[in-house]
Every structure is written in structure tokens, then in C-alpha cells.
Regions:
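Residues that form or immediately flank small-molecule/cofactor binding pockets and catalytic motifs
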Residues: 27, 100, 111-112
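Solvent-exposed serine/threonine-rich low-complexity stretches and specific carbohydrate-binding patches
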Residues: 106-117
């Protein structure tokens, strides 16, 4: 019919973890695979687009091989909050670093406050900042999931999901 559509655009964000080898220590839900964790494409607020990896029974835990020892000033990740789809924000995170990929030392641990039920669907960025910067080749990240939906939720028998998109290392 001669009509054209708008060009498709996708912004790619590069960081030290982008497209680096990643080893999952916990498996995501089969419907929400983990290819999106460090592909440089930021997930949208609609989790079904495929840019999100989802966990329902385990915390997310992964090791990224940066390829060589790098300076690390920040490790960050995006989490999705969508109470309507029983997706909750991360409950906390831990970061470890290693030079050999076998012996890790913990450099960060934080628990996050629960966001009140009914909050607007959104993407939340969580950051672990290091000053002075660290040096390591391997970064291990564990993102803890909420174990139960809020008391006000319409069906507390459902198990909440944790959806993670990009893992960033700067």
C-alpha cells in the first residue's frame, strides 16, 4: 500500500560486562531465559518483550568473566517492579570479585526496603559503588528475590518473580 513504518531503534549501552562470558549459578524460569543479562539492550517496562531474565524459585546468581583484570568502580543491575504481574523488586544484592574465578571475596552486601504494594510499574537500578576502585577479572553477583508477595496482594499464594535485565560493570 506504499506506507512506511518508522525505523526500529534500539539503544545499546556498553560497559565492561557487555557481551562477556557469563555463567549462571542459578537457573532462571524456563519461560524467561538469561540471554539478556549483559547484551547491552536495556529492558522495557513490559517484561514479555524478551529483554528480561526471570527467577521464581531461586535468587539470581551469576559470574561474569571480564577477560582480564579490570578496574571496577561500580557494579549495577536493573530490576523490574510490576505488582500486577507478581514481579517484585530485588530484596538485596551481594557482589564478590576474584582474579582466578575460583576464590572470591565479598566486597558488597545490601538489603533493599520493600516497595509498598500498589507502587507504579517501573525499572529500578541498583548500584554498588567502590571508592577506591577494585581490580579483578571475575565479578560474581547475587540478587536476592522477595520470598513472598506483600500482605495486601490479592493472591498471596502466588510466588513472586524477580526480573533482572542488564548487569553493568564500570
Amino acid at each position: 500500500d506504499g506506507r512506511r513504518s518508522e525505523p526500529f531503534r534500539e539503544e545499546v549501552t556498553f560497559n565492561k560486562a557487555t557481551m562477556k562470558p557469563i555463567r549462571l549459578l542459578t537457573a532462571p524460569h524456563p519461560k524467561y531465559a538469561a540471554a539478556a543479562l549483559n547484551d547491552g539492550l536495556r529492558g522495557k517496562r513490559v517484561f514479555t518483550y524478551g529483554n528480561w531474565a526471570g527467577w521464581q524459585d531461586d535468587d539470581m546468581e551469576a559470574v561474569i568473566d571480564l577477560g582480564r583484570q579490570e578496574e571496577i568502580a561500580q557494579v549495577a543491575f536493573n530490576a523490574l517492579l510490576d505488582y500486577g504481574s507478581h514481579i517484585m523488586d530485588a530484596a538485596g544484592a551481594k557482589v564478590w570479585v576474584s582474579d582466578d574465578g575460583e576464590t572470591f571475596r565479598e566486597v558488597y552486601g545490601e538489603h533493599y526496603p520493600e516497595i509498598p504494594y500498589g507502587a507504579v510499574k517501573r525499572i529500578l537500578r541498583h548500584e554498588a559503588n567502590f571508592s577506591p576502585a577494585l581490580r579483578a577479572r571475575y565479578v560474581k553477583l547475587r540478587v536476592m528475590r522477595s520470598k513472598q508477595l506483600p500482605e495486601a496482594y490479592f493472591d498471596r499464594n502466588l510466588r513472586p518473580f524477580l526480573f533482572i535485565d542488564e548487569i553493568y560493570v564500570y
